[in-house]
């Protein structure tokens, strides 16, 4: 289990992390001792310890059965980076709809907190649908580069660290910068829309947004947002 993944991701979406660590995660190389990407079980929460949403905000900050909108966006970013990273992702029961355990770390013998409250699902169904769309992308033909059986070469990645810890991460399916098709992951963990200067390899290609909030143009990323583009 990659505690590294859990801690680095949560720190990143809360504004305390480093973009270089997230780039390593997106390459499947955050845990340096691994010889294969599938040796990492990537997770944000498990059956014990705190629910990941309780580590982003206090349950006392919830209103009308859901956390603040900013916190939901932070959680979406964390879930997106989890499911779009090489390795084996693990999602705990209820995590897909932001199940809270009321900030209690050790819920051993706390059936009242461990039970899944499906009434809450009605309030956070949009997050559940986001999780479903991420899983669908990961399992698709376009998502094969998130399901690696072996590490890709450094020449198959181009990563740009932009302002405010933002990231442009390019995956080249072939070991050539003249690829006809590339994947572009854009990440903005800040509270403001940012613009990232993209590498020349992105110029002149047809753009298709696979997942994420739409923006005025490619390279402009809304606040607390993850986008995946296919460029052909």
Question: What are the functions of these language-model segments?
Answer:
Residues 69-72, 83-232:
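Carbohydrate-interacting/catalytic domains
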């Amino acid at each position: 289990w990659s505690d590294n993944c859990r801690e680095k991701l949560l720190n990143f979406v809360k504004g305390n992390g480093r973009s270089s660590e997230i780039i390593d995660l997106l390459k499947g190389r955050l845990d340096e001792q691994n010889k294969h990407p599938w040796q990492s079980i990537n997770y944000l929460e498990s059956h014990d310890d705190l629910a990941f949403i309780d580590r982003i905000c206090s349950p006392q900050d919830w209103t009308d059965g859901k956390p603040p909108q900013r916190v939901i966006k932070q959680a979406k970013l964390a879930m997106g980076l989890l499911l779009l990273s090489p390795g084996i992702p693990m999602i705990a029961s209820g995590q897909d709809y932001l199940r809270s355990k009321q900030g209690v770390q050790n819920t051993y013998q706390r059936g009242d907190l461990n039970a899944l409250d499906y009434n809450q699902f009605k309030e956070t169904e949009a997050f559940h649908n986001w999780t479903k769309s991420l899983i669908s992308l990961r399992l698709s033909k376009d998502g094969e580069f998130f399901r690696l059986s072996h590490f890709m070469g450094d020449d198959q990645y181009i990563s740009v660290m932009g302002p405010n810890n933002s990231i442009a991460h390019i995956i080249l399916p072939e070991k050539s910068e003249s690829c006809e098709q590339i994947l572009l992951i854009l990440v903005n963990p800040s509270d403001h829309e940012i613009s990232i200067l993209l590498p020349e390899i992105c110029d002149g290609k047809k753009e298709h947004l696979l997942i994420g909030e739409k923006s005025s143009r490619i390279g402009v990323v809304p606040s607390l947002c993850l986008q995946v583009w296919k460029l052909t």
